[in-house]
From Swiss-Prot:
The lineage of its organism: Bacteria, Pseudomonadati, Bacteroidota, Cytophagia, Cytophagales. Belongs to the anthranilate phosphoribosyltransferase family. This is Anthranilate phosphoribosyltransferase. Anthranilate 2 binds at R165. It is an enzyme of class 2 (transferase).
Amino acid sequence: MKDLLQQLTSHYRLTKEEAKEAMLAIGNGKINAAQVAAFISVYMMRSITVAELQGFREALLEMCLDADLSEYDPIDIVGTGGDGKDTFNISTLSCFVVAGAGIKVAKHGNYAVSSSCGSSNVVEYLGYKFSNSKDVLRKQIEEANFCMLHAPLFHPALKNVAPVRKELGMRTIYNMLGPLVNPALPTYHLLGTFNMDLARLYGYIHQSLNSKFAIVHALDGYDEISLTGGFKVISNQLDRVLEPDDMGLHTYKAAELSGGKTVEDAAKIFIEVLENKSTRAQKEVVLANAGLAISIAKPDISLFDAIATARESLESGQAYECFKKAVK
């Protein structure tokens, strides 16, 4: 690893195979914490290549527990995190709205590293029980149209980098990798990125995998559709910038999307959205993301119709019913 680190500090780009071997070595605990921190830091100072990202992804999937749920044709809705925006849990709420519309969801998530409350924090606080049992996950996705794969339970290799990530307290290559290494192997993907370069990288990765996907990046930095302005969409069908009114929705201020300072704050907003008692801004930003997700899983309907489907799921209480079944 010393030699590799020396090469990396001299602007060397890893091949796919070298990247995979490096990630396997880290995951298997063969690299000390100082070297892990140095390795991670390289990618905080320069952009990652497609080959490196592919190699890292392959290594993490090779080391993860089997949880293949592809027979259910599920979707994952996930952002990289690390955008520094501290929004409420938009992607996770969108999952339940999509589930309420009859689409299976296999959500890959984790505790917060660089924000106040991650997807795992809020669903656990509200009563969801994490499991890495395939039988439990099958039961959940069959009964609630939703299951959550809490990353540390499926990626034991991550335990070797968790302390370093926590100490760094900022986005790292692992933020980039999280959305790419869902052990459920979902059929459909809605991925949010914190910058445009990563959106393009994700696009290349998913095109090479023949995935059914959409990647979003809000032009003002959010890793999801924020309705605070324009946002880029890269998908099997689209590669363009959309505005909120292209979806029949309104534009909002960043402050209207705040997730609060604590898990309790985030959980309060979460339930208010599911009970259809939230602010219009909170409701519409969830509908925007859920609507785009529905349009990926149902490409034969328009984006407007997909948003209408999302609205029906939320306003009818079906989204909340899926949540209650998931946490029972």
